[in-house]
From Swiss-Prot:
Coiled coil: none annotated. It catalyses: tRNA(Glu) + L-glutamate + ATP = L-glutamyl-tRNA(Glu) + AMP + diphosphate. It comes from Streptococcus suis (strain 05ZYH33). It is found in: Cytoplasm. CDD domains: GluRS_core. This is Glutamate--tRNA ligase.
Amino acid sequence: MPVQHCLTYLFARHHGGTFLIRIEDTDRKRHVEDGERSQLENLRWLGIDWDESPETHENYRQSERLDIYQKYVDQLLAEGKAYKSYVTEEELAAERERQEAAGETPRYINEYLGMSEDEKTAYIAEREAAGIVPTVRLAVNEAGIYKWNDIVKGEIEFEGGNIGGDWVIQKRDGYPTYNFAVVIDDYLIKISHVIRGDDHIANTPKQLMVYEALGWEAPEFGHMTLIINSETGKKLSKRDTNTLQFIEDYRRKGYMPEAVFNFIGLLGWNPGGEEEIFSREQFIQLFDENRLSKSPAAFDQKKMDWMSNEYIKNADLETIFNLAKPFLEEAGRLTDKAEKLVELYKPQMSSADEIVGLTDLFFSDFPELTAEEKEVMAGETVPTVLNALKEKLEAMTDEDFQPDNIFPQIKAVQKETGIKGKNLFMPIRIAVSGEMHGPELPNTIYLLGREKSIQHIDNMLKSL
């Protein structure tokens, strides 16, 4: 869920800044083919537009900037602020295991510690002769204090001695690590504000070390609260099956992008007050980074669906019908009454794919009644109501069979039988649709058709 993208977009647009998309792809093991295109499509679908991106500018993919990173790696090596490390992954793992067994906090111990210059030269020659490709590590000032005034959380401070020792800025394959590359990119592209999740807080002191080593001024940082599952109270996980966390899921199910943007925009930020439905323009106007929440934001799928339903109810029929069309077509239900069916169920929908289940009544066998529905149909006045309505519907011509004419027939049954309220409407609804609740009854009867409505009532009477 691209919460940080959304809020960074609002920040940039509110302040009249430049919003850009940069592809951070230095971790080749996690590289996903076609992932970039998919991410950009999802942002476009949400209505997030940008000023600069790999589509319009060169070198906006980190994998295309290796020569730029190499320049600064070489600079730090030449200045003695970084060094080549020949420790193997196996040696690092063994040392980490030893430290954990001894109850120590795992950290990298400088491999050259205690070596003379001659010993160091011999060590490097031996390692290179063995074909070991080095990494490059930043020499950490362990006595240094790295602090910043976080936009969201206020002042945060780290001691240089508590970040795990000298850390890798360039991997064996020549690619930079994330914490090194983003500093180079942010500085050269003139990024003024970095807004991201608070899982990046531990990365910030490392990035400040790089800014310090290169003599550059750091941007402002803001770390947004983590997102928790509203049902479990725990950090949102990909394994949480009760939530839709990926934009692809919302697109696939036929949610309105405006609703998803609205929901995301309120995760970790709110403008104050009780209002929860905002247009994109209102979001941009109202956005205030000082109102970014310090407390965890709850991802509530029910609230997302409520919000989506509000958008669908207020959207024009053509928009929702076009959203629902693919689902109706796939289910073989794109009939001449399809648009009327969408209009009928539009007030109940949270996503367009729900139209298939909602319209089962019109295309499937009559559903099995629940215990509660059977209890309603056991009422002593039910046969009277159903027989009276059946007679009214049988007397109607096909030309007269319209929603505006069906409701007066139901009212006539009320007048003739003296039965009203739920004792009148509930048995009719259950007999016709097999459900206790649903859209307007005259519209349901009309779309079901006169013959099928009479057949359902007749079958119900026989079962009583």
